[in-house]
């Protein structure tokens, strides 16, 4: 509000406390008496002078007032009171500024009051008047000298009038807002009532109807949407998301739902679900637990469980399943299934494995195997009890029978039973007070005694444990002596704690040991080849005495010691025989699986070891320090897969410890065989020459050699063949016999596995199992096994008689099983050779492998798609056939260097049994042509003329001629060495 000059005019002068005194400059009204014309001129001049003085004084005073107005105005603006010597004009100026501030504050207050005022217009007018009077009263209280001043009153009235439009507008706006709020409030109540207990699927229809009602009440869509959003968020805060679900049906003209347009609703849905989860933790836990159990039981697969988890997270706001929890569950289940598969393999190996069974597996696997047997036989017992409905003693009898079967299996595999160790520990804790009046055998003791009776005698120490078995034997001895169960247990406890042996006991024990060693060393009475040498007897006696003393200290009686010494020595000391009456090599250690370890038939082990000694005889004797050949023996550690050659009863090592793989069984057998053939042929030649000299050409006829088969030689061994009439008559090994057959087969399957899935696609490294992966033909698993529709439907693959699951999270397809599956697939792809010149079984193993590789890659009848090759195979011209197959190195009509390499490898596989040159290089050129190079000179004796003519003098042969655009995508140009 501007202060105008006219607003402060006409005021009387005010007394000033500074400057000229009021007495000196006070304004006076000078009255001039009328004078006669003849009056004194002096008096007139005097009066005129006084008037001039008054005019000057008035001007000065007016200027003083104006200055004071400005000064008081500035003081008011800075919040200061008027000065004590302010003029009336200055005081009014100060008052106007204060009035301006007060009026503005009062206007803002009235505008704010208007928003909350609930009276009528008359009451509002009274409220405004009262507010004005309050301002005016405060003004007069502050400036009492201006009270009643008309000009000041007019100024106050004008100030109020200037603010009146604002106050009126605020009142009208507030009235409109209150009306709108009333409509919104009414609609809010309507929404709350109309949507109470309405489920989510019906909420959308209810909200759409309410939206129509809102528009009829002059509520805009935006206002309605905001109201619904807020109410939905409020409900979500207490775990109810029904209204939020309904907002998904409220769509604008563009078809976008309110839910999608308002982020608050989306976060509100999550909050509602989380609140629900917090309020229903038990229910959520039950849902999760049921899902986990269903998954572990195989009722849900991985995809189904993920969908269940997604549903749980949707109803719980993402709190039910975290990423780490999901991964942990899948990893745990995958590991469990992989472990189960591994245990099944162990159990199967125990059922059908080598004579040594599971002695070469790790300690952890042995414990796992024992645990697996507990689970397996407990399940079998429970299944039979359920099936038969047995109860009470009948059910216990079934459990006892399966427990005995379990102990028998542990004994067969020499696996220590953890349950027996636990029972032994509890029995050793029984005090004399507990045992004093004990008349009945405790359950723990019954378990140990049942185990002892169920386990083969020579396996009891290994299965039960040395001290545990000694305890059982001593308890049995005490009961035979008439002790009560309590007394017998105490007797067995004391025997188990003994550690010193009297001299008389030692003498008796030594005599018993001498008898056992003599029995073992004597070998067979019919054939003397397996009788132990004197050095072997000395070695046995030394170790037998050590074992006997240890067992005696542990508490074993002499009968038990003798039985176990005999079993141990028979397994750990073997005098191999080379023929009925010829002693072979002495072996310290278990030889029952030595043949498998060194890659030879078990019957050929004596021949292999003898050939090894012959090959290194001089070096071994030089290192023995003067020992003889008969003093050398093999010290074999089957568990570690190591051996040492020692000399004499002093066990002097003449070689360092070496892996058993150093003994190349097949190579040594081949060397021995070739030597025997040479000796036989020379002897036969000399014999026939003598016969010719004695009887003439017509007097002697060489007998026709007897025939044998590769299968017979493989099962009975080379040594047996060398002693057979067939060999003596001049027959050599069959043409399709192969040294290192098992090793070569293993290498072949490993090669195919690497070729089919060298990157190990689909292998779950956490669980150690294979899962399906996609390839060009669909879904495969393991080493290129194509999943059939039936397998996909069943969820398992049949490998032999085993049904093996393969789905992610449930897979039990371990690498070992994947290799068995590959072997099964390879054999199933063997082409039919019914009308071939050479049946498949009569082919050399190398040719068999080459054909299996082709058929596995191309399909069982894929060879028929190459007519020239197929005709050659049928005619028995295998080299021609494999060379013709080189031109099938294409995929989808494009030439592939990778496939050409594989065809060349198949050719090389087929040549493993002969002297035909192999392919050493493959070349691909930019013009699309492809070539292979043979490592040696090809002869017409090996291939047909047509093929021989294609091979250059440098060994290179063109497989494909040049052709633009013929190479498959990704095919590399250049040479590849095989």
Curated annotation (Swiss-Prot):
Record Pfam families: Phage_lysozyme
GO BP annotations, alphabetical order: cell wall macromolecule catabolic process; defense response to bacterium; killing of cells of another organism; peptidoglycan catabolic process; symbiont entry into host; symbiont entry into host cell via disruption of host cell envelope; symbiont entry into host cell via disruption of host cell wall peptidoglycan; symbiont genome ejection through host cell envelope, short tail mechanism
Location(s) in or outside the cell: Virion
GO cellular component: virion component
Primary location group: virion
Compositional bias per record (Polar residues), positions renumbered to this chain: 14-29
Superkingdom in the source lineage: Viruses
Positions of region (Disordered): 9-29
Swiss-Prot/TrEMBL keywords: Antimicrobial, Bacteriolytic enzyme, Degradation of host cell envelope components during virus entry, Degradation of host peptidoglycans during virus entry, Viral genome ejection through host cell envelope, Viral penetration into host cytoplasm, Viral short tail ejection system, Virion, Virus entry into host cell
SUPFAM superfamilies, alphabetized: Lysozyme-like (SSF53955)
Molecular function in Gene Ontology: lysozyme activity
Alphabetized InterPro entries for the sequence: Glyco_hydro_24, Lysozyme-like_dom_sf, Lysozyme_dom_sf
Known function: Exolysin that catalyzes the cleavage of the host peptidoglycans during virus entry.
Stated name of the protein: Peptidoglycan hydrolase gp36
Origin species: Enterobacteria phage SP6 (Bacteriophage SP6)
Lineage of the species this protein comes from: Viruses, Duplodnaviria, Heunggongvirae, Uroviricota, Caudoviricetes
């Amino acid at each position: 509000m501007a202060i105008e000059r006219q607003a402060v005019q006409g005021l009387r002068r005010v007394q000033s406390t500074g400057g000229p005194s009021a007495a000196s400059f006070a304004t006076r009204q000078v009255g001039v008496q009328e004078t006669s014309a003849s009056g004194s001129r002096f008096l007139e001049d005097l009066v005129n002078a006084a008037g001039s003085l008054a005019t000057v004084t008035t001007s000065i005073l007016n200027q003083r007032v104006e200055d004071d107005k400005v000064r008081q105005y500035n003081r008011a603006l800075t919040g200061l009171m008027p000065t004590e010597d302010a003029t009336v004009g200055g005081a009014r100026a100060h008052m106007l500024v204060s009035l301006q501030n007060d009026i503005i504050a009062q206007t803002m207050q009235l505008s704010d009051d208007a928003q909350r005022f609930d009276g009528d217009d008359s009451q509002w007018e009274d409220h405004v008047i009262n507010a004005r009077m309050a301002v005016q009263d405060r003004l007069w209280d502050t400036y009492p000298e201006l009270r009643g001043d008309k000009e000041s009153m007019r100024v106050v009235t004008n100030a109020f009038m200037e603010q009146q439009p604002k106050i009126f507008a605020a009142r009208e706006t507030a009235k409109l807002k209150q009306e709108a709020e009333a409509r919104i409030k009414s609609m809010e109540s309507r929404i709350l009532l109309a949507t109470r207990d309405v489920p989510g699927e019906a909420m959308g229809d209810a909200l759409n109807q309410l939206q129509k009602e809102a528009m009829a009440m002059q509520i805009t869509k935006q206002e309605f949407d905001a109201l619904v959003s807020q109410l939905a968020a409020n409900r979500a805060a207490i775990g109810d998301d029904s209204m939020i679900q309904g907002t998904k049906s409220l769509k604008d003209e563009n078809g976008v739902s309110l839910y999608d347009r308002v982020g608050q609703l989306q976060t509100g849905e999550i909050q509602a679900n989380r609140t629900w989860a917090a309020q229903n933790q038990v229910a959520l836990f039950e849902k999760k637990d049921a899902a986990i159990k269903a998954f572990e039981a195989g009722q849900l697969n991985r995809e189904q469980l993920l969908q269940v988890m997604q549903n749980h997270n949707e109803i719980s706001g993402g709190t039910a399943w975290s990423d780490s929890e999901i991964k942990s569950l899948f990893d745990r289940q995958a590991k469990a299934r992989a472990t189960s598969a591994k245990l099944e393999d162990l159990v199967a190996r125990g059922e059908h494995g080598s004579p040594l069974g599971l002695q070469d597996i790790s300690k952890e696997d042995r414990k796992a195997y024992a645990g697996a047997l507990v689970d397996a036989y407990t399940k079998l017992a429970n299944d039979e009890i359920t099936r038969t409905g047995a109860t009470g003693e009948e059910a216990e009898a079934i459990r006892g029978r399966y427990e005995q079967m379990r102990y028998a299996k542990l004994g067969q595999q020499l696996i220590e039973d953890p349950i027996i160790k636990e029972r032994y520990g509890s029995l050793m804790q029984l005090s004399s007070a507990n045992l004093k009046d004990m008349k009945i055998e405790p359950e723990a003791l019954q378990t140990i005694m049942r185990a002892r009776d169920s386990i083969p005698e020579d396996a009891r120490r290994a299965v039960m444990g040395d001290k545990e078995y000694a305890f059982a034997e001593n308890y049995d001895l005490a009961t035979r002596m008439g002790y009560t169960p309590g007394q017998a247990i105490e007797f067995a406890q004391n025997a188990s704690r003994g550690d010193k042996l009297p001299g008389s006991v030692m003498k008796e024990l030594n005599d018993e040991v001498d008898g056992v060693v003599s029995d073992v060393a004597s070998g067979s009475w019919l054939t003397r080849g397996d009788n132990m040498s004197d050095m072997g007897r000395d070695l046995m006696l030394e170790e037998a005495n050590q074992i006997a003393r240890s067992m005696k200290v542990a508490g074993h009686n002499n009968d038990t010691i003798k039985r176990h010494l005999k079993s141990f020595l028979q397994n750990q000391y073997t005098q191999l025989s080379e023929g009925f009456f010829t002693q072979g090599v002495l072996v310290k250690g278990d030889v029952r699986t030595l043949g498998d370890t060194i890659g030879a038939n078990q019957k050929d082990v004596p021949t292999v070891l003898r050939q090894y000694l012959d090959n290194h005889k001089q070096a071994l004797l030089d290192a023995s320090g003067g020992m003889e050949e008969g003093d050398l023996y093999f010290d074999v550690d089957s568990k570690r897969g190591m051996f040492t050659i020692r000399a004499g009863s002093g066990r002097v090592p003449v070689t360092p410890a070496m892996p058993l793989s150093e003994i190349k069984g097949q190579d040594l057998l081949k060397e021995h065989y070739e030597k025997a053939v040479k000796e036989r042929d020379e002897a036969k030649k000399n014999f026939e020459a003598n016969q010719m000299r004695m009887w003439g050409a017509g007097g002697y006829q060489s007998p026709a050699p007897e025939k044998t088969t590769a299968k017979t030689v493989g099962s009975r061994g080379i040594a047996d063949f060398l002693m057979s009439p067939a060999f003596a008559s001049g027959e050599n090994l069959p043409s399709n016999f192969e040294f290192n057959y098992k090793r070569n087969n293993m290498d072949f399957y490993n090669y195919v596995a690497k070729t089919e899935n060298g990157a190990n696609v689909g292998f779950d490294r956490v669980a150690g199992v294979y899962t399906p992966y996609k390839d060009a033909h669909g879904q495969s698993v393991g080493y290129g096994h194509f999943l059939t529709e039936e397998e996909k439907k069943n969820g398992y693959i049949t490998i032999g008689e085993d049904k093996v699951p393969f789905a992610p999270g449930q897979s039990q397809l371990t690498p070992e099983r994947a290799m068995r599956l590959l072997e099964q697939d390879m054999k199933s792809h063997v082409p039919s050779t019914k009308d071939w010149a050479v049946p498949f079984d009569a082919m050399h193993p190398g040719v068999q492998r080459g054909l299996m590789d082709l058929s596995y890659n191309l399909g069982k009848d894929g060879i028929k798609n190459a007519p020239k090759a197929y005709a050659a195979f049928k005619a028995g011209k295998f080299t021609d056939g494999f060379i013709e197959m080189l031109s099938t190195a294409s995929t989808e009509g494009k030439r592939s260097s990778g496939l050409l390499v594989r065809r060349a490898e198949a050719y090389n596989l087929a040549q493993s049994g002969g002297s035909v040159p192999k392919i050493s290089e493959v070349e691909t050129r930019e013009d699309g042509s492809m070539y292979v190079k043979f490592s040696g000179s090809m002869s017409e004796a090996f291939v047909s003329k047509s093929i021989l003519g294609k091979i250059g003098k440098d060994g290179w042969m063109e497989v494909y001629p040049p052709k633009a655009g013929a190479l498959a995508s990704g095919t590399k140009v250049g040479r590849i060495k095989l």
